[in-house]
Swiss-Prot record:
InterPro entries: Dimethylallyltransferase (IPR039657), IPT (IPR018022), P-loop_NTPase (IPR027417). It is an enzyme of class 2 (transferase). Its cofactor is Mg(2+). Its EC number is 2.5.1.75. Catalyzes the transfer of a dimethylallyl group onto the adenine at position 37 in tRNAs that read codons beginning with uridine, leading to the formation of N6-(dimethylallyl)adenosine (i(6)A). This is tRNA dimethylallyltransferase. The record marks T108, R130 as: Interaction with substrate tRNA. One of its GO terms (biological process) is tRNA modification. One of its GO terms (molecular function) is tRNA dimethylallyltransferase activity. Belongs to the IPP transferase family. Residues 42-45, 166-170, 247-252 are annotated as: Interaction with substrate tRNA.
Length: 316
């Protein structure tokens, strides 16, 4: 939206960036200087009992800057972009009513997109249709279903790996329910966000620095008890790798290790690689993002000053 169309709207701030880029530290610093309240935009931080492997803000950090939308789901539960949009809008309205500015911080870019642009009118999940797809997969295999999706919706099929049953079944389910492809329906936008948003992205200047930060943080997680945390989840017996919670980077690789499918060193290597792949996807999203102010995570003081400078230059 242009400045003209956002005139008179309440203000909001987006602080985006790849994993391990220093978003939380900057958000906490801004909380000390501005009338902001924080909302987490992270599909992993919603889960209770998944603290170390998700790099959830510590108790000390949360005391300085409480985050909304943390610990709102059990790991056995799913949480959609539509649910995030609904919940975030409620939190943003409450913060605005209190005379403060919502500061949304995190790296789940799909959530930001859903919030900014609204959601496409996708049909709700249908257990009967999903069961039929599962049955087809049991008989013919997921690769056969992927070939079927290639015929129905080649654009979606090109994006979805044959070994990703969750996304594959959803793409087929949408078509079987609505008669329209996922690609067709996602071109239809929903309601635009009724806020004047200032958007910032913080990231290291080079890919090597991102990789270095990710490796350091993964080893820190292990030293802080990540394996014990994952073992407690594994021991529950009701969680598995098809669930969004256990598909989170680090947890999926730890699950394979705990199941005896891989050794410790391989788990560490795969966990770091998966986190690097996540950061790469996040950076791909961000490079195509409009109206974003870039910040260098290697210069936190300059990043902090830049945010204050941009915000003070805005009218209102």
């Amino acid at each position: 939206m242009s400045e003209q169309t956002t005139a008179g709207l309440p203000k909001a701030i987006f602080l985006m960036g790849p994993t391990a880029s220093g978003k939380t530290a900057l958000a906490i610093a801004l909380r000390q200087a501005l009338p902001v309240e924080l909302i987490s935009v992270d599909s992993a931080l919603i889960y209770r009992g998944m603290d170390i492997g998700t790099a959830k803000p510590s108790a000390e950090e949360l005391a300085l800057a409480p985050h909304r939308l943390l610990d709102i789901r059990d790991p056995s539960e799913a949480y959609s972009a539509a649910e995030f949009r609904r919940d975030a809008l409620v939190e943003m309205a409450e913060i605005t009513r209190r005379g403060n500015i919502p500061l949304l911080v995190g790296g789940t870019m799909l959530y930001y997109k859903a919030l900014l642009e609204g959601l496409s009118p996708l049909p709700s999940a249908d257990p009967e249709v999903r069961q039929r797809i599962e049955q087809m997969a049991g008989e013919a295999g997921w690769e056969a279903l992927h070939r079927q999706l290639c015929d129905i919706d080649p654009v979606a099929a090109n994006r979805i790996h044959p070994n990703d049953p969750q996304r594959l079944s959803r793409a087929l389910e949408v078509f079987f329910i609505s008669g329209k492809t996922l690609t067709e329906l996602t071109k239809i936008s929903g309601e635009i966000l009724p806020y004047d948003v200032s958007q910032f992205a913080i990231a290291p200047a080079s890919r090597e620095l991102i990789h270095q930060r990710i490796e350091q943080r993964f080893h820190q997680m292990l030293a802080s008890g990540f394996e014990a945390e994952a073992r407690a989840l594994f021991a529950r017996g009701d969680l598995h790798t098809e669930m969004p919670s256990i598909r989170c980077v680090g947890y999926r690789q730890m699950w394979s290790y705990l199941a005896g499918e891989t050794d410790y060193d391989d788990m560490v290597y795969r966990g770091i690689c998966a986190t690097r792949q996540l950061a790469k996807r996040q950076m791909t999203w961000l490079r195509g993002w409009k109206d974003v102010h870039w910040l260098d995570s290697e210069q936190p003081d300059a990043a902090y000053s830049r945010v204050l400078q941009v915000l003070s230059a805005k009218p209102g």
